[in-house]
């Protein structure tokens, strides 16, 4: 089972669009499947993001909340709007060799 952390800025209230989010997540998960020669059923999503949890449930992919334990993480997919806390998390993922990719997102101005 490959455990994939899907993470975003902690105070970020939404995404540019659901369509963009799910397409991006699907593309990155396909990349992981190719790298590890596995199926989507061999992946477990770790996330506290409602959209990631909804995506996982809709696609019958196991998911669980991320408990800040980096030993539980095999790969990281990040959605980043430039928050300094998020940059630290991305740097940690890079230093551990876990980062799949980063998608830069814009904050909703509402």
Model-predicted segments: where are they?
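Acidic/glycine-enriched connector segments
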Residues: 8-110
